[in-house]
Amino acid sequence: MRTLMVATVVCVASLYAMAGEVSLDRAFERIRSVADATCKVTDVSLRLKSDPKGKDPLEMWRAEAKEDVAVTGAFVRVDFTLAPEKGSDIKCRAVLTMPERWDGRLWGQGNSGRAGSLPDLDAYVAMDTAAVTTDLGTRAAGPKFLDKSVPWPAGVLRDFHWRATHLMTVYGKRIAKAFYGRPCEHAYFNGGSTGGRQGMSEVLRFPEDYDGVISVLPDNNAAVSDIALWHLWRQTHGPDGKALFTKEELKSVSDAAIEFMANTDPKPYAGHIIADGRFSESEIDGFLAFAAKKIPSIAEADKVARLKAVYMPLVHDGKCYFTGFAPGTNSGVNFHWGSLLSLPHFLAGKGFPQSRWNEVGFDQIDMYLRELSPEFNACSPDISAFTKRGGKIIMTAGWEDQTIPPGPIVDYYERVCEANGGIGEVSKSMRLFCIPGCAHGGGRGRVMTGSPSGMQMKKLLVDWCENGRAPAQIHVKWRDGSVDMPVAPYPGLYRQDADGAWRIEKRPRGVARIDAKCLETKVVLPGNFR
């Protein structure tokens, strides 16, 4: 393999020389010269194939479909580390297709969960493009960075919240220019979950970094997402921390929601999935009464009241902290510690580890909102600095997603519409697609696994940004292949007529309005890295 790699390097370098181009060695030197006080280039290498695939530790939280791609040509891989302040250790990777095949684009790839590892970039190599990604620097918190009882240092939080993504982009562009001898013509960002928040942080804080952003099941209402899961924990656990519901009970409650709506939801959703996860209070009462008859154990004590609290907006002192969970998820409203991001670390630093969560109330939540969430959130409705440059955003929400509940995403889009001239004007630059049957990341929804991203979404974004064709729909396939389902831009819903033809039904708009104090977003000026 070593002989083959050397031969390939010589061959490629010879081809460049014949074409009057700078040699590959000189190109590598230019890449290394990008290094400065913030950036250390640790490896530049010609690759002939991808590394063997291991188990992805963040697969469950990667909010996009898996892509089986084959890397068939040589490419250059660049590993670099960023340290904008003492204690930062942001690992990054760029892949660069060979110059004769490069499409002139650079893609930023988002991460997932608490990150700490580098996402796979093979799909970009197969696309003959360039891409860059980062682990968001969270491993700098120490070997127990995933331990929720360990507070994260302030610098690590800054890197995770917004700084790592911006610096990754700045140096990724420099590396691409150094290799290709010219700047990229277009820059795009693709991310889901945490990656969706990364993309929206770029839109709001550094609007010149990208021309277009794919934000799949985004955690841009980051504080609200964690508050929602804290609320779910409170309602489904007793004072001793023990679960009040079995997994089977919660799954049966979700099944009851599907059955309850079967007579009113249109085809092909009826009896299979919830067409629209926004239930009125009367619908919540109705389906829970129906569920209690089918599942006698949830009629005990105050279980029905607790379940109603899960699905209804979370309101305290007249202020809405969360819109409520959407009924009908495949696994039921099961609490998962792994889905929480910054709140447990924050509470641990305030003397409330997991063992004391039964003592956490709105005083601690309000403290979290004041002290941490403004840099964590990426949910300012003012996207004008990005859209005035011609920037485009494709955003999705999943009606079966309980990790990043869909309600706050819909609320965010509505606030964007209010702040930017209405939905007609906003749809020229940003579109939201709410997907029935879509759970989070690698999660299994009732009819589909994963969420639409991959090549379909990338093509739609490029076509919108470069050719002016806005996405009229996206397509998802049911797992069993029985339905190829179009998804309309919000607030539309595709329904199937008796003859099998699809048509768009306009649905009501809006959800419960989250209070502004939960959504504060500090927009940091470029260059202000501390």
Q: What kind of region is each of these model predictions?
A:
Residues Y210-A301, R306, M448-M455, K459:
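A catalytic-pocket lid/entrance helix-loop region that shapes and gates access to the active site
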Residues L341-P381:
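Mobile cap/lid helix-loop segments that gate and shape the active-site cleft of serine hydrolases
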Residues T403-G407:
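Conserved alpha/beta-hydrolase "acid-adjacent" motif
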Residues G20-D103, L118, M261-A275, S282-P353, ...:
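Catalytic-loop region of hydrolases
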